[in-house]
């Protein structure tokens, strides 16, 4: 902890994301802070939270600064889906009760509900069905939200996406590596996992580290 340097972190990944960026760092430290109270955790959490917010341009859009032009996306790995799944985990564990971020539990739930509605309105659909980059990650969010809050997901939206996925051949287009590889995050293993999770209440979310 004494050697932690935020400038080095900024140079390495100046973007908000659960898998690779500030959101993942914040979530890890919130877990650590719950187990071992340490002011140094709180300091880094607050700094990372500020930096994540500085990348937010509008509702559910965080700029990815790895490229000069900067862009936002809705992927799990480095976009809004992963960020909001992490926040769903925060809500479940009531992490905001442990630290003052200027963000209340009520505001968090409102954002989580609004993101659910954004997904179900089809505003952030893609032509990809992988867990890392596609629509099935969005469905994973809806499943987790329903199981945590009891607020039902829109089955018409789910049916629409599943029907479209079948027509599109469960395409993992534009994912790194081969289209429709057998991999979990960008391939057919992950697609089958999501279908199984939708049909079985006892399967937890891989995308939320099996915490939802």
Residue ranges: model-predicted function:
Residues 25-76, 80-86:
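Acidic, glycine-rich loop-and-beta core segments that form the ion-binding/anion-interacting portion
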Residues 40-44, 61-64, 93-107, 129-132:
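Short acidic alpha-helical/loop segments enriched in Asp/Glu that coordinate divalent cations
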Residues 14, 37-41, 97, 101, ...:
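Residue-level recognition of alpha-helical structural elements
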Residues 21-24, 79-82, 134-137, 187-190:
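Periodic glycine anchor positions in long extracellular repeat architectures
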Residues 31, 86-102, 110, 114, ...:
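Terminal, non-catalytic domain-edge segments
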Residues 1-16, 53-74, 112-133, 164-181:
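Glycine- and aromatic-rich loop/turn segments at beta-sheet edges
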Residues 76-78, 84, 124-148:
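An internal, amphipathic alpha-helical element
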Residues 1-43:
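Solenoidal tandem-repeat scaffolds enriched in leucines and small polar residues
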């Amino acid at each position: 902890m004494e050697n932690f340097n935020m400038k080095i972190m900024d140079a390495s990944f100046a973007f908000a994301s659960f898998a690779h960026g500030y959101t993942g760092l914040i979530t890890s430290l919130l877990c650590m802070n719950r187990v071992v109270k340490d002011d140094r955790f709180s300091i880094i959490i607050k700094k990372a939270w500020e930096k994540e917010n500085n990348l937010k341009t509008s509702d559910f859009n965080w700029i990815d600064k790895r490229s000069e032009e900067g862009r936002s996306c809705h992927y799990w790995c480095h976009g809004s889906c992963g960020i909001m799944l992490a926040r769903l985990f925060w809500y479940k564990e009531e992490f905001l009760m442990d630290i003052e971020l200027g963000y209340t539990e009520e505001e968090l739930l409102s954002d989580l509900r609004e993101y659910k509605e954004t997904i179900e309105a089809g505003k952030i659909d893609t032509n990809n069905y992988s867990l890392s980059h596609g629509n099935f990650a969005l469905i994973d969010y809806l499943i987790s939200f329903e199981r945590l809050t009891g607020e039902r997901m829109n089955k018409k939206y789910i049916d629409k996406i599943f029907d479209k996925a079948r027509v599109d051949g469960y395409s993992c287009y534009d994912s790194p590596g081969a289209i429709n590889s057998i991999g979990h995050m960008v391939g057919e293993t992950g697609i089958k996992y999501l279908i199984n999770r939708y049909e079985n209440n006892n399967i937890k979310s891989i995308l939320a580290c099996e915490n939802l």
